[in-house]
């Protein structure tokens, strides 16, 4: 049975349009609260990013949870991985994040974490959806008795607790003293946290894009727009730059030359560091979108590599299936299960900094063992949300077949719909730049014409 509202990363959409409305948020809170209240402490944590719409959705969810008899603890603007960590620390039934991650301010979303700090599984989401459907269509939302209504409280020291958690994943014998780091918080949830983590570990920190106003989150900044970070690294002659996205669950780097170090290269750096110390347990989990260069570089070290479906939840599932510790995506979602239960941009960045310090080399030098193959990704925006019918058309299928025949064993093609936006992603990878670009545009044209 497929999920109706939960995409690859919870519920997401444009604010004010279904399902990102106060009514939906309230009924989702009630449905989730009813499911979660059947066992556990009957308390949930709610965190959010810096979008102005977060206040509206937070209040609506509070009402829904209270109606279901579930208490709510508010932790304010907080990175997504912080909510996962704190939900586990406070023994809550669940953590709720109100965020649309790297999307523009006019989008928002809602996702849940279990009390073990991992994302809800498909079965739990389906159970919540079944109740939600009744609340939406049959007016089946029922309030508990007045004396059983949930209460709301604030946790004032949440940021400090999470800062200490992040610092605790960095070895005590190492210090960032002597490193000049530029941190781009994307005007997002980590604006008051990330700079303090690096400063307290000894680094000289230049903080940019750290003044959220409710509408500037991810606006030409952060992990999806690295231009301002590249410029700042060069202007300040920094050792490196770190970019988080709006909810700080992904991270990208810029080396001292201003060159981008993406999620695939971060995975290589972490695997290489563990391998050099004889600490690599198992292999690495990437996704269907992971650059072939990562797979080849890991193969040189005899490190196994498998591809999961796109989405960090599927990377986590594959890691648990294999018993491995390290996985992630080129977009900067990095999973290091020995340190955190979900993708954590700050924690992942600290592991990279650890690798830099222990190698006594620059970031540019330690990534040099991996050569990325030319990869072109074209996002084709759809007029309608019916991506499945477009992918099923004969013309699109024929275009893919022809491209694969042309590339032969020198490349690969991947066509997939976005789980969060009305997009079809066309990815082509091969040993030749021109060939890669040409074939990607050929398939993208077929998608647009379908």
UniProtKB/Swiss-Prot annotation:
Reactions that this protein is recorded to catalyse: alpha-D-glucosamine 1-phosphate = D-glucosamine 6-phosphate
Protein name: Phosphoglucosamine mutase 2
Molecular-function annotations in GO: magnesium ion binding; phosphoglucosamine mutase activity; phosphomannomutase activity
One protein family per Pfam: PGM_PMM_II
Bound cofactor: record note: Binds 1 Mg(2+) ion per subunit.
Alphabetical GO biological process terms: carbohydrate metabolic process; peptidoglycan biosynthetic process; UDP-N-acetylglucosamine biosynthetic process
Function description: Catalyzes the conversion of glucosamine-6-phosphate to glucosamine-1-phosphate.
PTM entry text: Activated by phosphorylation.
Residues the entry annotates as binding Mg(2+): 101, 245, 247, 249
Catalytic residues (positions): 101 (phosphoserine intermediate)
Family per similarity comment: Belongs to the phosphohexose mutase family.
């Amino acid at each position: 049975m497929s999920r109706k509202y939960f995409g690859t990363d919870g519920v997401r959409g444009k604010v004010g349009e279904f399902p990102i409305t106060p009514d939906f948020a309230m009924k989702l809170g009630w449905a989730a609260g009813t499911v979660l209240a059947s066992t556990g402490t009957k308390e949930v944590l709610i965190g959010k990013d810096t979008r102005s719409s977060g206040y509206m959705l937070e209040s609506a969810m509070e009402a829904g949870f209270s109606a279901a008899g579930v208490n709510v603890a508010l932790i304010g603007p907080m990175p997504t991985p912080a909510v996962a960590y704190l939900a586990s620390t406070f023994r809550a039934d669940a953590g709720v994040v109100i965020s649309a991650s790297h999307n523009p301010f006019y989008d928002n979303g809602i996702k849940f974490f279990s009390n073990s700090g991992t994302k809800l599984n498909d079965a739990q989401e389906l159970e919540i959806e079944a109740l939600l459907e009744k609340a939406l269509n049959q007016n089946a939302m029922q309030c508990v008795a007045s004396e059983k209504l949930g209460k709301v409280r604030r946790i004032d020291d949440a940021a400090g607790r999470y800062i200490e958690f992040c610092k605790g994943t960095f070895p005590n014998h190492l210090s960032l003293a002597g490193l000049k780091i530029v941190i781009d918080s994307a005007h997002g949830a980590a604006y008051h946290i990330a700079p303090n983590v690096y400063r307290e570990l000894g680094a000289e920190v230049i903080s940019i894009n750290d003044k959220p106003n409710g509408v500037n989150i991810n606006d030409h900044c952060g992990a999806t727009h690295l231009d301002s970070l590249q410029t700042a690294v060069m202007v300040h002659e920094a050792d490196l730059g770190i970019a988080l996205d709006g909810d700080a669950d992904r991270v990208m780097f810029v080396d001292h030359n201003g060159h981008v170090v993406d999620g695939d290269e971060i995975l290589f750096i972490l695997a290489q560091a563990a391998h050099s110390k004889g600490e690599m347990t198992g292999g690495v989990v990437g996704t269907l979108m992971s650059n072939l260069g990562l797979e080849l570089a890991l193969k040189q070290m005899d490190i196994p590599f498998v591809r999961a479906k796109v989405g960090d939840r599927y990377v986590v599932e594959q890691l648990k299936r294999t018993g491995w510790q390290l996985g992630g995506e080129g977009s900067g979602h990095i999973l290091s299960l020995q340190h955190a239960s979900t993708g954590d941009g700050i924690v992942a960045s600290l592991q990279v900094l650890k690798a830099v310090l222990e190698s006594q080399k620059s970031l540019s030098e330690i990534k040099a063992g991996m050569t990325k193959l030319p990869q072109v990704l074209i996002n084709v925006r759809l007029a309608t949300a019916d991506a499945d019918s477009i992918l099923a058309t004969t013309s699109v299928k024929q275009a893919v077949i022809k491209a694969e025949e042309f590339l032969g064993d020198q490349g690969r093609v991947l066509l997939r719909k976005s789980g969060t936006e009305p997009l079809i992603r066309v990815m082509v990878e091969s040993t030749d730049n021109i060939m890669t670009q040409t074939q990607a545009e050929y398939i993208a044209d077929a998608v647009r014409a379908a």
